[in-house]
């Protein structure tokens, strides 16, 4: 709840700054931040689409694009916060799709636990797509986005934020578009060096920890 309120404020400020319905691309592995945006939309904030942006551990992308929420083997990537196959916050969306039927949701989650799979029916999938789009990026695509943004804007993105940016590029929605940034690039020196051959310096306020 606290996370939803805090992130709801973030969404609210951004929409107020534009004055028009806005699309958000949200880097996510566990479906928490993007679900907060969904709650903000349900409460009346004029959000158009929420893009679920993830890496090659793409269970959320497969759920939204194909209607199959099915766990696969986790791959280690340069965006480790997304190295997840079962997104715990997705249960909240299932609960909402079940019209807040806790018993049905409990059965669905039990089925996921036992079989590693949840098939989303057409009606529920259409409801999801009214609010969400999705995209996944490979390792090479993520590195290319970091390079592209640096060359175009002289801004260094961390791998997670790069996935959010790349997911937006894949959909290229009209209107106001905002990519949520996540971590400081200095946390991912190997990825940054590989993408643009640059060392991302530690912020001065954090230098004391080393």
Task: Describe the residue ranges of each PLM region.
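A conserved active-site cap/scaffold subdomain adjacent to cofactor or substrate pockets
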Residues: 22, 26-103
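Single conserved hydrophobic/aromatic residue that forms the stacking wall/gate
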Residues: 1-11
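Conserved active-site and cofactor/substrate-binding residues in soluble primary-metabolism enzymes
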Residues: 5, 32-35, 84-92, 137-144, ...
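Alpha-helix C-terminal capping segments
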Residues: 13-16, 35-46, 166-172
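C-terminal structural cap/anchor segments
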Residues: 117-172
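Catalytic phosphate/nucleotide-handling subdomain of diverse soluble enzymes
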Residues: 45-62, 165-210
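Hydrophobic alpha-helical scaffolding
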Residues: 5, 26-30, 58, 79-86, ...
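Long, amphipathic alpha-helical stalk/connector segments used for oligomerization, subunit docking
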Residues: 103-120, 128
